[in-house]
Amino acid sequence: MEQVKCFIPETLEEALRIRRETGATILAGGSDLMVANSMGAGVTPAFKGDVLIITNLKELKGIRALPDGSVEIGACTTSAEIAASSLVPELLREAASRMGAIALRNSATIGGNIGNASPKGDMPQPLILMDAEVVLTSVDGERRMLVDDYIIATKKTALREDEIITKVIIPKQDFTHTFFRKIGMRRANAISKLTLSAAATVRGGVVVDFRASSGAAGPKVARSRKAEELLIGKKVSELHT
């Protein structure tokens, strides 16, 4: 059996070069990937190919507000860091705070949660609702696309073999009301059976923007477009009668 190589680059530039040359599997927090390749307790996981560990790359960490009001989140920023940041929209903070156990939230990254493309992932749903974009980087440069377009189906994404998810961009949000609900077999440390998200902007008693989606019930997050169209333009007083 051919020996699997493990690469630990010191810079993003080095990581991109290795990714181009080897096509190695990207590993950040490893909360899903380590489980998927587990051989049992106390046994080294058996990866089927080379592994590129990017957890230590400073270029992929941190949260910052941009001049246009959008928020940039590095791909290796953890769920716990996102949940604790006042820069992050409330809808995403709530979803991040609901992910699994505390230990998992301290290791799971936003890039991994998107890249894993699991319909049960907690963070992609609010990201899709907010029209967030993912930045995909290779040695040739960057390209940006909506998270909704990046996740094609269960475990299927638009990531190319030489690319790495480097950041997520959330456009400026002006929602006046947001909602996130996760349904699982228990209150904590649960895998989602169903997730529901909604966000609305109400001005002068009128719904000027409304978005809703569900997750974990299909191959990817589903926007409730018809429900959105029905509510936009309605007076809030009409919705209570």
Model-derived features: positions:
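C-terminal structural segment of proteins
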Residues: M1-T241
